[in-house]
Amino acid sequence: AQSFRNEQGFRKKKEGWLIKVITYQSEAVLRILKSGQVYRAHKSLSFGKQYGALVDILQLNCESPVFGCLKYHRRCTNGKVSSSVKFLLEVPAEKVKLTEYSVWADFLYAQKFTLAEDYSHVAGLCQELDQETLDKMIHSLQKQKRPWQYRIPQAVLEEIRPEWVIK
């Protein structure tokens, strides 16, 4: 079990470590959580292939991931739009996968150059992307490190549970 002792944004409970995650979601998500139900994202129409690839890479059990950032860490974007609601969550550490934000952004772009049915293979001869670079991106997304080892960590969750919401 990983120890996050002396790292800001982590708290130890008898059940294990909790990580503070900030996420912006719609008001519909707020209603779901207030009703005591678990929120799980539906498959994205726009990014279905990319999100499905990330679900596979991180071995998640969901249709589509829920994204957030870690409190007290650098963030590239906050994900806020005018109609969104900010949630502060305390999530059990084993329920949080982390990726490097810039690698995820590069991977999203790279998917334009992969086979339609296989995110892990470059489609034919491509000047914009070679197989070695794609393999390195996938490996980087898979490899889980301590939060402070990421330049800009992105939190990836399978779901949001009502008991995780602290604000």
List PLM regions with ranges.
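Helix N-cap / beta->alpha transition motif
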Residues: W17-V29, L88-E94, R161, K167
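ADP-ribosyltransferase catalytic core
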Residues: Q50-G124
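Arginine residue identity/basic-tract feature
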Residues: R5, R11, R31, R40, ...
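Generic serine detector
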Residues: S3, S26, S35, S44-S46, ...
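Active-site and NAD+-binding cores of ADP-ribose-processing enzymes
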Residues: V91-K167
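Alpha-helical structural elements
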Residues: K12, I19, S46, C62, ...
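ADP-ribose/NAD+-binding catalytic cleft of ART/PARP-like enzymes
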Residues: A1-E63
